Design a protein with these regions (language model features):
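Short, flexible active-site-proximal loops enriched in glycine and acidic residues
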Residues: 83, 112, 153
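Active-site loop segments of alpha/beta catalytic cores
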Residues: 133-357
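A short acidic, glycine/proline-enriched capping/turn motif at secondary-structure boundaries
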Residues: 90-93, 108-109, 118-119, 161-163
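Short, basic, glycine/proline-bearing loop/turn elements
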Residues: 50-62, 118-130, 267
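N-terminal basic, low-complexity leaders that serve as flexible interaction/assembly modules and, when applicable
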Residues: 11-105, 242, 341-357
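Short, positively charged and aromatic/hydrophobic N-terminal segments
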Residues: 3, 7-10
Length: 357
């Protein structure tokens, strides 16, 4: 434990060589836009596939701190992004609470048990120490920070309560999450109890990541868009707001994919940065948000299937549409696994070469 605290104190005091991301998030002056990609540490890189191929699969990689740290750093060296994001998965939280999951090849996550009744809340435990059950994530953060040696910031993350609720009640991925949404109508008391528990654990988890050395954190609400405006306000934003209000130790980003009807409410959250998906017009969203928030995004991930010239053109078109220097460049969603890494480099280099007006 003393060793871990010594490492933490070292990195708290360490100056970040490339702190563009953090300055952009705080609204400070930047000489160019910072750029990174969601899912940058992943299957687009042969080097990642080599590390994963030596293990039993994705979960073992997530749960092995040394290897998770290794693939976290790969995009910094190979792609030249301005930030690292810890290699992990949003589903480590429900597993820590009591619902184990498996990742089925070509199908995605699958839970043997689900929570659809009050009795099943035994699988939503909150009375545990984060380091005991999720220490492999915080250890990966410590190792990655040591290896990064202050080159770029390290981002931690978690799933938003509504998205985690979807998996804990549906038991697998879904286009509609009808079982999850049904509970909102048939047993809203259960829904709020489960969301409350997820929120409690998520706050502790994000704080643990920051304590381990994460310089910034992001909350992913991947399934925000399947709810209507009123439902998302009650079952999504209410709990997202609790999280952003509780996290004040580091800049925080919220990414509520598809929640267009709730744009004004999202803009009012006490966060530093708001992620924007590719279906949202960035100029319109900036008008809603104003100048007091940083925006992140929002190139269509499929643009990276285009020619290098087209990637450069579309990236410049996006950059020219920004109305503010308060911006972190990213895709509007995670990079797809079959994208050519060279196209990703074209995207990144185009951003780096762009002159802010």
């Amino acid at each position: 434990m003393i060793y871990k605290w010594l490492i933490l104190l070292t990195f708290v005091a360490m100056k970040i060589e490339n702190d563009l991301l953090l300055r952009a998030a705080r609204g400070e002056d930047i000489e160019r836009y910072p750029v990174w990609l969601m899912r940058q540490a992943g299957r687009i890189l042969p080097e990642y596939r080599a590390v994963r191929g030596a293990l039993s699969g994705f979960k073992e990689l997530v749960e092995t701190p040394e290897r998770a740290a290794e693939v976290t750093i790969q995009p910094i060296d190979i792609l030249g992004v301005d930030a690292a994001i810890i290699f992990s998965d949003i589903l480590v939280v429900p597993e820590a609470m009591g619902l184990e999951y498996q990742l089925i090849e070509k199908k995605g996550p699958w839970f043997e048990k689900t929570i659809r009744s009050t009795d099943e809340l035994i699988y939503a435990n909150t009375n545990f120490d984060i380091e005991d059950r999720l220490g492999y994530v915080t250890e990966a953060i410590r190792i990655a920070n040591k290896e990064l040696n202050g080159r770029v910031p390290l981002i931690g993350f978690a799933g938003a309560p509504w998205t985690i609720f979807c998996y804990m009640t549906e038991g697998q991925g879904s286009k509609t999450f009808s079982e999850s949404r049904k509970i909102l109508y048939t047993n809203p008391t259960l829904a709020h109890e489960l969301l409350d528990r997820i929120t409690e654990v998520t706050i502790k988890y994000l704080k643990a990541q920051i304590n381990a050395g994460a310089h910034m954190v992001q909350v992913f609400d991947s399934w925000a868009g399947i709810l209507g405006e009123r439902q998302y306000e009650e079952f999504g934003l209410k709990y997202m707001e609790r999280i952003v209000n509780a996290i004040n130790e580091a800049p925080i980003t919220v990414f509520a994919k598809g929640a267009y009807a709730s744009a004004h409410k999202i803009a009012a959250l006490n966060c530093n940065t708001i992620g924007v998906d590719w279906n949202t017009d960035m100029r319109t969203f900036r008008d809603i948000v104003g100048e007091n928030k940083t925006l992140q995004g929002n190139l269509d991930p499929c643009v990276l299937y285009s020619s290098h010239n087209e990637v450069e053109k579309m990236t410049n078109n996006m950059l020219n549409s920004f109305k503010s220097k308060r911006h972190i460049v990213n895709l509007g969603h995670g990079v797809y696994p079959d994208v050519d890494p060279e196209k990703v480099k074209t995207f990144i280099n185009t951003v780096k070469n762009f002159k802010i007006k």
